[in-house]
Amino acid sequence: MRLSLIAAARAEGVAAKGLLRAHKWWSLRRLTQIMALGVFMAGPLAGVWLVRGNFASSEILGVLPLSDPFIALQSLMTGAVPAGVALLGAALIVLFYLVVGGRAYCGWICPVNIVTDTAYWLREKLGITRDRKLDRRTRLWVLAGALLASFLSGAIAWEFVNPVSLLQRGLIFGLGVGWTVIAAVFLLDLLVTRRGWCGHLCPVGAFYGIVGKTSLVRVAAARREGCTNCGACFQICTEPHVITPALKGTGSTLILSGDCVNCGSCIDACPVNVFEMTMRGRSISPH
């Protein structure tokens, strides 16, 4: 029943907006993810070195350093102070996500999101209803565990099992242990629990959620008085608990939780255009 309701809600959105408009933010997001992965892959596979490095640490055109601040924090926990250029790269990333929202990384950049979205899509198509409940705070414990492991081992612990790094290496060097981890993430989301990895376990998402909690760019239920209670936004959202205060509350219409990935899926799904992307009140929705 639940899956048929999801399909009906999506069909209503497509009927109201048309196929392209009902997938506008999804299309932009997927294009951004593919482009991000593509620039990292272009060097090793085609000799086009726009970016050298990986999602953890890289350099754009040999000039602009970028470093994952979560990696930098783990490095500090090992007792090693990262090089100045690495700290600069981490600071640039933090500043960027303070503007666009920390977990925008999850929805717009992270290639593993493509894996988990595919698992969710297939889950619906196959009618899989099993949904083992996990506390979403578990990812905070995994985050703390990664930092503690780095402190105790003197190594950047999360990189040994980081699905993002393992996926990139697997695409370049072929099959290996990395694909086992990616398969485990896929099967978790497909067979065990809805949005299990991104929504409940990933420490990188937990970290960026903390970073971007006060970010400028937000989704808003700007026209919540027009809500028809179809439930499409809740069904499609990777973090549905973030919607309720903005949509059903009496205070701010902004979705203020750091868990929001600013993906725009609720904007796409809503047949009556309740939601919009805003920057402290100024609409930045694409046209």
UniProtKB/Swiss-Prot annotation:
Pathway: One-carbon metabolism; methylamine degradation. [4Fe-4S] cluster 1 binds at residues 227, 230, 233, 270. GO terms for cellular component: plasma membrane. Keywords: 4Fe-4S, Electron transport, Iron, Iron-sulfur, Metal-binding, Repeat, Transport. Gene3D superfamilies: 3.30.70.20. One of its GO terms (molecular function) is metal ion binding. Pfam families: Fer4_5, Fer4_7. The keyword Secreted does not apply. Residues 218-248, 251-280 form the 4Fe-4S ferredoxin-type domain. [4Fe-4S] cluster 2 binds at residues 237, 260, 263, 266. Involved in electron transfer. PANTHER family: FERREDOXIN-TYPE PROTEIN NAPH. This is Methylamine utilization ferredoxin-type protein MauN. The lineage of its organism: Bacteria, Pseudomonadati, Pseudomonadota, Alphaproteobacteria, Hyphomicrobiales. The gene is mauN.
